[in-house]
């Protein structure tokens, strides 16, 4: 890697890591090494990070003491490996965004909550000029890739934003006021679908602004039955962002008598699914699969390497970047919190306590004016 004439990088950096002493807890390390890129990698100086539920869920389920945490980020390319420099189309100084495969036993260095990170060049995307650091970090890759996988790989929906269906069909997005939910709603509307969704009544206006045709209160014990009545027993597709026993039951209750497809964002409880209608095909997706790498996680999360899915992601990435760049889709509502990496842990704990609703928490790491 040639670095002649480039500013020297510091030898060490700060990072939010999984606690060495307390499983599921986090701490700020002051002396993590600044990475050196492999041939197909970039080094990115991180400008902003956003929070996802996986930032606290996965470390709790699969503790990796000392591993860097965090998925979504935006930042500036400061170094490039030889292959990345030749093939990526990027240049030093480009604004990029992406998602890290954090909390990995094989890749403990991988994580967004740090000052400098390394990433494969085909896992990042160039940030359009109309997006700020904070907006780009809020998009990241985790949400966009998982939603895309759910709609077109798992649920096999006909129609895309580029080629919408001509006769609208109904799709349920359970958890519409989440970042994944508002993105899914927008994609479905662009693809020609009618969208029913669930959220708290305080967020009805929010999901309607993003395109939902009808919102239902997920607190209601008859939520699923109410959706089934509203859709005249014809609903075929349910995307469950939340994926808990209660939400699975609601989604199955909403799907019409003819059956259909259900897709969750979490490992499905086999004992529960075994008791549900066989006319509904149930699957779940995991955004980490977009890397194409083996996902070496226990407890049902293991995945074989899937290079075909990575190829799909590389195409999908260019498509959703174009949607945001053209203004056809917009980011989830953002709440910017100051304090840098030292305060990221507070945000993670807020999410763990379920205090975040209808907003995406973003922490800028850059100095204004620089």
Swiss-Prot record:
Pathway: Mycotoxin biosynthesis. It holds the Pfam family ADH_N. Its EC number is 1.-.-.-. It comes from the Eukaryota. It is an enzyme of class 1 (oxidoreductase). Trans-enoyl reductase; part of the gene cluster that mediates the biosynthesis of xenoacremones such as xenoacremone A, a compound that shows inhibitory activity toward the PI3K/AKT signaling pathway and which has the ability to induce apoptosis of A549 lung cancer cells. Within the pathway, cooperation of the hybrid PKS-NRPS xenE and the trans-acting enoyl reductase xenG is responsible for the formation of the reduced tyrosine-nonaketide derivative. The alpha/beta hydrolase xenA then accelerates intramolecular nucleophilic attack to give a pyrrolidone derivative. Monomer. This is Trans-enoyl reductase xenG. The gene is xenG.
């Amino acid at each position: 890697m040639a670095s002649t004439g480039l500013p020297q990088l510091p030898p060490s950096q700060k990072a939010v890591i999984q606690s060495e002493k307390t499983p599921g807890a986090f701490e700020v390390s002051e002396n993590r090494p600044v990475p050196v890129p492999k041939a197909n990698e970039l080094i990115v100086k991180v400008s902003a990070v956003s929070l996802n539920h996986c930032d606290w869920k996965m470390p709790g389920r699969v503790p990796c003491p000392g591993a860097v945490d965090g998925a979504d980020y935006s930042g500036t390319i400061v170094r490039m490996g030889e292959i990345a420099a030749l093939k990526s189309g990027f240049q030093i100084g480009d604004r990029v965004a992406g998602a890290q495969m954090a909390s990995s036993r094989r890749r403990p260095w991988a994580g967004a909550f740090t000052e400098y990170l390394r990433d494969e060049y085909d896992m990042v995307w160039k940030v359009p000029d109309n997006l700020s650091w904070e907006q780009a970090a809020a998009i990241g890759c985790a949400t966009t890739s998982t939603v895309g996988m759910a709609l077109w790989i798992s649920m096999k929906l006909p129609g895309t934003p580029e080629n919408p269906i001509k006769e609208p069909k109904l799709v349920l997005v359970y958890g519409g006021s989440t970042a994944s939910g508002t993105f899914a709603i927008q994609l479905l509307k662009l693809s020609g679908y009618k969208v029913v969704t669930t959220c708290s009544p305080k967020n009805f206006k929010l999901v309607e602004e993003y395109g939902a045709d009808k919102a239902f209160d997920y607190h209601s014990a008859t939520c699923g039955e109410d959706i089934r009545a509203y859709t005249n027993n014809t609903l075929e597709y349910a995307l469950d962002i939340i994926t808990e026993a209660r939400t699975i039951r609601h989604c199955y209750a909403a799907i019409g008598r003819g059956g259909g497809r259900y897709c969750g964002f979490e490992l499905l409880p086999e004992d529960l699914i075994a008791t549900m209608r066989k006319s509904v095909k149930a699957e779940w997706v995991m955004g980490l699969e977009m890397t194409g790498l083996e996902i070496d996680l226990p407890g049902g999360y293991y995945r074989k390497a899937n290079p075909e899915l990575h190829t799909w992601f590389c195409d999908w990435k260019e498509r959703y970047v174009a949607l945001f760049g053209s203004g056809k889709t917009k980011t989830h509502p953002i709440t910017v919190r100051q304090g840098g990496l030292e305060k990221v842990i507070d945000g993670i704990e807020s999410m763990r306590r379920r205090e975040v609703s209808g907003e995406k928490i973003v922490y800028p790491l850059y100095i204004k004016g620089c």
